[in-house]
Curated annotation (Swiss-Prot):
Subunit architecture: Homodimer.
PANTHER family attached to this UniProt entry: HISTIDINOL-PHOSPHATE AMINOTRANSFERASE (PTHR43643:SF3), HISTIDINOL-PHOSPHATE AMINOTRANSFERASE 2 (PTHR43643)
Protein name: Histidinol-phosphate aminotransferase
Cofactor names: pyridoxal 5'-phosphate
Length: 360
């Protein structure tokens, strides 16, 4: 028997392209177009090159304390991971060990079913409605847990706090995992519900609203008991997942609330103007509460538009996936970048109309 017979087969997650070209408009992986707050002050106070010879803190307690204070929680309710993907992975491995299926929307972050396949977790995709909305009643069935991205990726739609609480009430024997990667761009965080529900785990990230995708910092919040179980699993893999520099930069990003909120508002304003411009061009656009928009044009195939944008050095995201294969996800960049996208789309659509007229 060959060793290949013992391999665990899995279809890996396909990340958005990270091109090395510099003369492009990169709108495919939901990065923040603005730089993070200055870290120079904290580096001068805390960072010493000689400290690189030492292992980092095993639990990033200083950063956890600042996050706990920021959200009015206890430090025992916070765990830091190497990006939210690691925190999600640990959560799947820790909490979803039932024979009943883990429930998730059929249109959502594509890493979820991969975790299930990798960890052999039974799961069930629950169809969203024709407008991509999650139907609360569909999550009131027997399950081994629930995972929902709020706002969702790629649809950018968000549930309100009342809907999430209804799911929590109806599933008090299961962990309900809410992924809030994009919550700062217009959604309503469910962190206040941690005071009432010990079956709630909330995952957030420094990658999007805090402009720190390059250092990989993710966070989970929950009851002290739930977080302690996450630590048990985390420490079974890696005692030192967060390097010292990332911990310092994470703390620095929490120091300037004014700068943080100003950047958020700039992105939201750009998003709303961009949405209006798209609608004027005939696009259908979901009610985005994220730093991206999900769009469809009735007269243009999404795959063809994706390729045309790519040739114009504008990189967006397209999936060959049922129900959304005629939609594109476009990250919100700077005003200048989004204006260039609109100008390209105007020219592309006009050219298409002329071709259609000629064919007639």
């Amino acid at each position: 028997m060959s060793w290949q017979n013992n391999l665990r087969s899995v279809s890996p997650y396909i990340a958005g392209e990270q091109p090395e070209l510099t003369d492009i408009i990169k709108l495919n992986t939901n990065e923040n177009p603005y730089p993070p707050t200055s870290v120079a002050q904290l580096f001068n106070e805390r960072y010493k090159t000689k400290n690189l010879r030492l292992y980092p803190s095993t639990d990033a307690k200083s950063l956890r304390k600042k996050l706990a204070d920021y959200h009015h929680l206890e430090v025992e309710q916070v765990i830091i991971g190497n990006g939210s993907d690691e925190v999600l992975s640990l959560s799947f491995l820790t909490f979803f060990n039932s024979q009943s299926p883990l429930l998730m929307p059929d249109i959502t972050y594509s890493f979820y079913p991969i975790y299930c396949e990798l960890y052999r977790i039974p799961f069930q995709k629950v169809p969203v409605d024709d407008d991509f909305k999650v139907l609360i009643k569909d999550y009131c069935i027997e399950n081994g847990g629930i995972v929902i991205a709020n706002p969702d990726a790629p649809t950018a739609l968000a549930l309100n706090l009342k809907d999430i609480e209804e799911i929590l009430k109806k599933n008090q024997n299961s962990i309900v995992l809410i992924n809030e990667a994009y919550i700062d761009f217009g959604g309503e965080t469910c962190l206040p519900l941690l005071k009432k529900y010990d079956n709630l785990v909330v995952v957030q990230t420094f990658s999007k609203s805090r402009s720190l995708a390059g250092i990989r910092l993710g966070v989970a919040y929950g009851s002290a008991e739930a977080i302690s179980h996450l630590y048990d699993v985390k420490n079974s893999f890696n005692s030192y997942p967060i390097d010292s520099l990332a911990q310092i930069i994470g703390e620095a990003s929490l120091m300037d609330e004014h700068y943080f909120q100003k950047n958020i508002q700039k992105i939201i304003k750009t998003r709303e103007v961009f949405k209006d411009n798209l609608v004027n061009l005939g696009f259908e656009v979901t009610d985005s509460k994220a730093n991206f928009v999900f769009v469809h044009h009735p007269k243009v195939k999404a795959e063809e538009l994706f390729k045309a944008l790519y040739e114009a050095k504008i990189i967006v995201r397209h999936w060959n996936q049922p129900r959304i294969d005629d939609w594109l996800r476009i990250t919100i960049g700077t005003n200048k970048e989004m204006n260039k996208v609109i100008e390209f789309l105007k020219g592309y659509l006009k050219k298409n109309e002329e071709i259609d007229e000629w064919k007639k």
